[in-house]
Design a protein with these regions (language model features):
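Sec-exported extracytoplasmic/periplasmic mature domains
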Residues: 52-56, 68-72, 110-121
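A solvent-exposed, charged loop/short amphipathic helix patch at secondary-structure junctions
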Residues: 29-34, 81-97
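Short, well-ordered alpha-helical segments enriched in acidic and aromatic residues
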Residues: 58-86
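Short, low-complexity N-terminal intrinsically disordered segments enriched in polar/charged residues
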Residues: 11-57, 61, 65
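Surface-exposed, charged secondary-structure patches
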Residues: 1-8, 87-159
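A short, surface-exposed beta-strand/turn
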Residues: 2-12, 20, 156-178
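Short, solvent-exposed aromatic-acidic interface loops
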Residues: 16-27, 148-151, 180-199
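Hydrophobic residues on conserved beta-strands that form the core of alpha/beta folds
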Residues: 13-15, 124-126, 179
């Protein structure tokens, strides 16, 4: 892992975070199909890295500040159960079911606080990051990414999932951008990614 160091305009260190891997970072800066300038890409990537670190650091206060008060938040959990195989009716087979939940900002933050208090660690990795600008609102940006989540509670219970997150960021105030939408969908075999776009919300 590499570190990123953030500085204020006065040269004071304001943050030290683990970074996304260098290949992903350079790929995003080059731009691909998106219409974002390099400066804005750097700004968005900095906030995406900070956002990921807030989960790892179990920093509910920072997460609370980054979501707008009326944010649309859709979370999901993968529930695994054992059941008999439909083929032979005898052998055991793991079945997965996804449970979605639409939450207000306060519900989401309260649930995170409870999770953080009861968890020994939370590991979150972001990859396959894609940036896009809203078609009609130049201050809104969509970020699609793959998220791998792993956590372990103090009682030993573990949870892990692999899915896609879409974030709709409002950069009207570039020093304090707000997330208006956060959605999660599970990664399916053969799936390339989430197809959400800023104009969907």
């Amino acid at each position: 892992k590499e570190l990123t160091i953030s500085f204020s305009r006065d040269g004071v260190i304001t943050g030290v975070r683990t970074a996304i891997d260098n290949n992903s970072y350079l790929s995003i800066l080059r731009g691909g199909k998106s219409n974002l300038d390099t400066r804005m890409r750097r700004e968005i990537l900095k906030f995406v890295e900070d956002f990921r670190s807030y989960y790892v650091e179990k920093n509910a206060t920072a997460l609370e500040e980054i979501f707008s008060d009326d944010a649309l938040i859709i979370t999901g959990r993968v529930i695994k159960t054992m059941g008999k195989s439909q083929t032979d009716g005898i052998s055991q087979q793991v079945r997965e079911r996804v449970v979605y939940s639409k939450q207000s900002k306060q519900q989401y933050i309260n649930n995170l606080k409870a999770l953080f208090r009861s968890s020994e660690f939370v590991n979150v990795d972001f990859s396959d990051i894609e940036l896009m600008r809203h078609g009609s609102n130049p201050n809104f940006y969509g970020v699609r990414l793959r998220q791998k989540w792993a956590s372990q509670r103090y009682n030993g219970n573990q949870y892990a999932d692999d899915g896609y997150v879409f974030l709709l960021w409002d950069f009207t105030d570039e020093t304090q951008p707000k997330i208006h939408v956060r959605t999660w969908t599970p990664r399916r075999s053969g799936q390339e990614g989430d197809h959400s776009a800023p104009e969907d919300f």
